[in-house]
Amino acid sequence: MNAKNSTIAICLIAILVFSPVASFAQATITFSGEAVALRAKALGISLDLSDTGPLPARGGNLSTSLASVNVLGLASADALKSTTSGSGTSSQSQSSVASLSLLGGLVAADVVKSTSSATCSNGQAAVTGNAELVGLVAAGQSILVSNPNLAISLPGGISLIVNEQTSSPSGNTGSITVNALHVKGPSIDIVVASAQSGITCS
């Protein structure tokens, strides 16, 4: 091999070893997400309604809906909808219900909706979430929602958490779950409009 051909061969090896394409293949973003319109456990009943199921790590789009539900004495609602998706540098989830009534009207609302998102920027993860409630009434009292994790005590040893948010952003990984309403009590656990989003940035 002459000197010219040797130089060309060395250049080709350098291109293959230091190619940006090889580096790009390692920079993989993975996603997580799930949205559930109504999750309830009470008196031997277990419900997961309008549940998207978990989003694959590769991302994609999942959605589900239900016209109405009525479990006597426990929960009734209309227009249950849930979506979760992941692509590019972000994942998002959303869930909503209308005409909600829980525990015979102890908790009621015209519209209940939650949203969450997780994004990557410069290799770092960030998460955001929000709950929207229209016409929320608990034990006959109108409730205005502002900050997350508003706790309200109700009769019968029942507690209500409004705009419940739990998040764990840490470096290149982040996850957040927003439960628009969470009712807990003796043998009762009800979550309305839950939206979880997560991401790992590489």
Residue ranges of predicted features:
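Extended, solvent-exposed, non-transmembrane regions
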Residues: A25-S202
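Bacterial N-terminal signal peptides
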Residues: I10-P20
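Bacterial N-terminal signal peptides that target proteins for export
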Residues: N2-I10
